[in-house]
Amino acid sequence: MSRKTIPRETEKPKKLTRAQKKEIDAVIRKYKGDGKPRTAQATIPYEAIYPDGVCRIDRRTFSKCIAFEDISYQLAQPETRTAIFEHLCDLYNYVDASIHVQLSFLNRKVDPVQYAKSFEIAPQGDDFDDIRAEYTAILQKQLASGNNGIVKTKYLTFTIEADSPKTARARLTRIGLDLLGYFKTMGCVAHVMDGQARLEVLHGIFHPDGEPFRFDWDWLAPSGLSTKDFVAPSSLCFGTAKTFGLGGKYGAVSFLQILAPELSDEMLADFLKTESGILVNLHVQAIDQTEAIKTIKRKITDLDAMKIQEQKKAVRSGYDMDILPSDLATYGEDAKKLLNKLQTRNERLFMLTFLVLNVADTKQKLGNDVFQAAGVAQKYNCSLVRLDYQQEQGLVSSLPLGINQIKIQRSLTTSNVAVFVPFVTQELFQSGAAMYYGINAKSHNMIMLDRKQARCPNGLKLGTPGSGKSMSCKSEIVSVFLTTADDIFISDPEAEYYPLVKRLHGQVIKLSPTSKDYVNPLDINLNYSEDDSPLALKSDFVLSFCELVMGGKTGLEAIERTVIDRAVKAIYRPYLANPCPENMPILSDLHQALLDQHLPEADRVAQALDLYVSGSLNVFNHKTNVDIHNRLVAFDIKELGKQLKKLGMLIIQDQIWGRVTQNRSQGRATWYFADEFHLLLKEEQTAAYSAEIWKRFRKWGGVPTGATQNVKDLLSSPEIENILENSDFITLLNQASGDRKILSERLNLSADQQKYIDNSEPGEGLLIFENVVLPFSNPIPKNTQLYKIMTTRLSEVVEL
């Protein structure tokens, strides 16, 4: 076997022939490539995304991302809109030249079939499955007519350069906290995203059909895959000048040419109103203030030099030297104004790139979507232009990674950038046990709420006759009945709820002077109060009851209160010693306990009670003989008459409070709907007790709702402040002009918001939940069984 001699390093290598050189160059080119990515993963321009949300774009560039929610802007008070705009300006001014900011607004379609299934109410094999099916159909119809097939999300990505990941993390964390502070001042909910959330967003962009994202950090090491493999599309094709292929879909990236002399704060919102899949990105790069001022001064110097040349030319030609080309004069004035803004006002200079990414199933649909977006730009005197041979760079720049490879930029000041307000209207779309409350009239999205999760779930429904107030209550009752196991009680002064309660197999308790249904106002249970003794709160109720019975503007005197309290303690002593139904006192026991004190004040109270104990209005002087353990109970008090109606409402409220205290120990909520609620607050004697109960309901798992058409009476109550402060849910339907003015002042409604309660159709108005005010519409189709059992129109009421 012959040996090959290995040449020493000092030996001169053999000279290559021309053919050998060409062969080697070909091999190098083959393996080195032309710099173009050959895989979908290679197009995604980052090196790594870490679990804490830091993205390493290259060796020295790092980014983090904040997800933020919408807030009510377009319908807000003018001063609120101004404040939001100023806070946006502050946010942009915070960003210096070392921080690149990217705002991303993603409208992504979800699987409509899976999305619709999430609104299905499962059948339970009882008599209400047909109603469940009909109610589900109503929800799914509203879903189809609205925009809820599109999930709208908003992101702010900030990018910096650093020498190491450790240094980058420290600075990114600090910047993130500062930016969250700015969002908080705007009343906007925001949070810094972790790595998995950022990957899920990328996956959603690359998989527009809503394919579920499956990923776990523990999968990376065993599989040998990178995070890109979990988010990349099946294919990317950039073979044409103005479109690209994304899996089985087509996409196009366009840039916005800002030609308008003035910009509108509604332009960005109009881009996002489209019902197609769209991704809008704003890349904002601050320019160092000193450098910006120097640049503008140089421009002014150049313009002045051109002006001098034009003046010399004018002198040589023999015409007036003050006559200059109009463009030159305009540019000179604009440059000086810009310099003045930077030097004397809180303005900075930014370079803005505005990109719009459309994705569709077909080229024709893509063309239509791009045309629609271009129409929005045209509306504001701007132009949307497709990128030529830069679609790949456009796609990369549309990913919320903080990278901008499109160098088509427009210089704008702080206020010009902030005019692209990223807010429209706040959505109310809670998950979990949320119930349907209508359609957001501004965004056409469904309103899904869980009142029990609110700080104070108590609510009010206010509207003129015929505005849909009763329908609103009944719609909520149906939702509670079908989707929860909660108890529901109704105080029904007009006997309007009977058809609904009967169809849902509920119980109607008819209270009247001639009825045989009796409810004892002195009923009590051992859980009646938080205190060791339940008598303290019950004594308050009896005092309110007696005040209402005795009438008068001054209420009970101090001695009268004392004798009543003494009598209350006496009549409950046997029951507290042995809590059985036989020992439960009734009004005649209270009457006798007052007489037994042999005091003039006690006798005076006893005489006032005579009418309700042994007189013609003794309907409440009986032990309770109705079973109120049905989960749906309506108290029909229509025939109580004017004299007894207020007493009846007070007694019903107390009965429901007793049920609330029982249900709390079982972990069950209790809903209470009080129609003509103003009657309880109109009289000072009952207002204080009602306000106290209103406050206590929240702690004990109660969800009360007061409904009335007499807004003036309601708002004139001395206790209305307590009621409003403890009510985080208010439905405003059509209002009379006087009531609308009062409500607008009380609830701080803007002029635009007031339009939704002025001559509005039945079932339309404003919904206030915590600090959110939304215009809504909640129509119930007339051809449904639900409508027939809920309507109160005489021509539509049917016998069941």
Locate the predicted segments by residue.
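Hydrophobic positions on the alpha1 helix immediately C-terminal to the Walker A/P-loop
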Residues: S472
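A short helix-turn-beta junction within AAA+ P-loop NTPase domains corresponding to the substrate/partner-engaging
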Residues: H505-I509, E719-L732
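Conserved lysine of the Walker
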Residues: K469
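Conserved P-loop NTPase
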Residues: L747-L800
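Extended, folded cores of ATP/NTP-driven motor/assembly subunits in large transport
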Residues: S2-F423
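Post-Walker A helix-loop "phosphate-sensing" segment adjacent to the P-loop in P-loop NTPases
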Residues: S479-F489
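Hydrophobic anchor at the beta1->P-loop junction of P-loop NTPases
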Residues: K461
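P-loop NTPase motor domains
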Residues: I71, P78-A97, S104, R108, ...
